[in-house]
Amino acid sequence: MPYEILIPRQVERQIAKIPREFATRILDDLEGFADGLDYKRYDVRKVVDSPKTAPRYRMRSGNYRVLFFILHNRMVIEVISIRRKKTGMDY
């Protein structure tokens, strides 16, 4: 059974600022991950300094990073933010 994806309004605004082809890829990756929770295929890892009671996770999708919570008891993935990865070329 797939997990439900919750995207708050502030994250929707972040998605609106991303070029369409990247936004589509990010949302497709999120949906694919929610269907099977395949951590390796979608490059999902626990954020290092996140609390053990409510760990945050990150997913890489191209040059973007998606931060989210996985609420297993409710079968929900709650997206916190979607940001562009900072590289040495960004000033």
Model-derived segments and their meaning:
Residues 23-25, 29:
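A short, well-structured alpha-helix characteristic of acyl/acetyltransferase catalytic modules
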Residues 32-58:
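A short, surface-exposed loop/turn module that caps and links secondary-structure elements
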Residues 1-2, 33:
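A short, ordered amphipathic alpha-helix with a cationic face
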Residues 2-4, 9, 13-17, 24, ...:
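Enriched for short, Lys/Arg-rich terminal
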Residues 21, 32, 56, 67-68:
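Intrinsic disorder/low-structure terminal segments
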